[in-house]
Amino acid sequence: MSTRAKVAVLRTKPESVLEDYRRLLKLADADRFLAPGKTTILKDNISWHYPMPSANTTPWQLEGTILGLHDLGYNDLSCVQNKTVVIDTYKGEDLNQYVPIFRKCGLPVLYNFKESDMKWVPFEPKVKMLALDRIYPKGLRIPDYFFGKNIVHLPTVKCHIYTTTTGAMKNAFGGLLSTHRHYTHTLIHETLVDLLAIQKEIHTGVFAVMDGTTVGDGQGPRTLKPVVKNVILASGDQVAIDAVSAKLMGFDPMGIKYIRLAHEAGLGVGDPKEIELAGDDVSGESWGFDVGWNFHRVMGWLSWYGPTRFLQKLLFHTPIVYFPIFVSETYHDRIRWPLKERKIYEQWKRDTAWGRLFTEYQQKGCLLI
C-alpha cells in the first residue's frame, strides 16, 4: 500500500499507565477509526486462563482503554468473550482480574458460545477468501452480535508457535470462528487475512490497543518467557500494529506470512518503511526474540504441517479429537503451570513493578473507574 499507516507507541510505567493509555488512544486517533453512536465491542485476549505474564490482556490495559474510550465519547461499550477447547473463559476473566472492572463500570459481558447472548448466522463475504471457503465448504457462520458495531482488540506483544507472532489480527480468531476453528491451523496465515477482510465488512470500526508492559518471548501463546519492556501501542491499522510489534520483537514483519499477505491484499500496511510511529521513538529497538521448540509445538507441527498432517481429519474431525485435547490440557494445566509457569508468575509478581501492580488489582479490583 502507498498510504502511510500510523501506530502510536508510548513508554510507560505502573504509576502512569492508566493516564498513558488514555493519551495513547488520542495519539492514535481512535475517534477517526471508530464510528460515533455505535456500540463498541471490547475483545480481550485470554490465551491461558491462568494469569501468565504477557499471555493475556492486562487489567490496566482493559481499564485504561475503557477510560480512554470514555474520554472520546464512546460510552456504549460491551465485552465479548469466546471459548476454546482448552481454555476456561470464566476462570480466565476471573484470574486475570477483568471481572471487577466489568462490574465497576457496568460493562455488559456477552459470550459468543451462549445462544442467549448471540447466534451464529450464515455469512457470505463479498471478497474472495484465501482459505475459509475451503475450510468451511458448507458455509461460514459468524456471531450476529458483531454486525454494525465497532470493535477494539486488546492483544499483548508475544510470540506464537504457529504464526511466529500474535497480536491484533490473530485476536479476531476467537470472536469470529467457532470452537471448530482448530480446523484452520494448516492455513492459519491465510485465515487471519480472511478474518481481517471480514471485519472490515461487518464492523463500523476496527481498532487495536496492545500491551507490551511485559512481553512474551518463546513458545507462545501460553508457555512464554516474560520480559519487561514498558511499552504500549495502538492503531486503527491492524496490520501495521502487528508489524511494529513483530519488528520490536526482532522479526522481519514482511517475512511473517500473515502480515505480508494482508499488506499485499491492501488490508493494511505491513512494511515498517511505510509506517509512521507517533509518540516515543522505538524504531531502533529489536529484542531478539525466538519462538523455539517445545513438546506442544512439535505435536502441533506434526498435526498441522509435518509428514503426518494427512491424519488431520481422523484426529480433529472425529471423537478422537478429545485425546489431543486431553494431552494439551494435561501438558499445560497439570504439568507446565504447577511445575514451571506458576513459579515464573509468582516471581514476576514479587520482583517486577508490573507484578506488584497486578497484585494491587487483585486487592482493589480496579484503580480509577
Give each language-model segment a name:
Residues 1-369:
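N-terminal and secondary-structure boundary signal
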